Amino acid sequence: MNKQARHFKIREILQRHSVENQHDLLQLLREQGMSVAQATLSRDCAELGLMRVRVNGSYRMVVPDDNAGRIIKGLVGIEVLSINANETTVIIRTLPGRAHGVGSYLDQLKSPLVLGTIAGDDTVLVIPASVHNISSLIAYIHSNLSKT
């Protein structure tokens, strides 16, 4: 089964069932005759932007609505303390323990300006695709990490 069909089936299952985690989702997929590896399901969940939300005291996996991107952008923006750069790299300082989330968010945006990110505890190193586009990269980061 191709990725598009899996994504459709995952969305369908999450709309019809209360699913707490990937293991439960994997079981439901298998019950419906789909053979999916855990690693593949994990990638699918990341690509779909699935979130775990608390509902009536327990967690449930959900597909984010169209408003979720704006909300996530605002939440990630709150975690950023500063953005600085030199001629070759950009450094983002975050609240303690939040660098991984900020770096992961930037990676998921898949900008052609970003070659990659490396995150520590409170610092994200953003490696530009070209050192000639540092100012464009900084503007891009600011626009995608706004608090509003």
Curated annotation (Swiss-Prot):
One of its GO terms (molecular function) is DNA binding. Keywords: Amino-acid biosynthesis, Arginine biosynthesis, Cytoplasm, DNA-binding, Repressor, Transcription, Transcription regulation. Pathway: Amino-acid biosynthesis; L-arginine biosynthesis [regulation]. Its main location: cytoplasm. One of its GO terms (cellular component) is cytoplasm. It is found in: Cytoplasm. It holds the Pfam family Arg_repressor. GO terms for biological process: L-arginine biosynthetic process; protein complex oligomerization; regulation of arginine biosynthetic process. Coiled coil: none annotated. Signal peptide: none annotated. Belongs to the ArgR family. PANTHER family: ARGININE REPRESSOR. Regulates arginine biosynthesis genes. HAMAP family: Arg_repressor. This is Arginine repressor. It comes from Chlorobium chlorochromatii (strain CaD3).
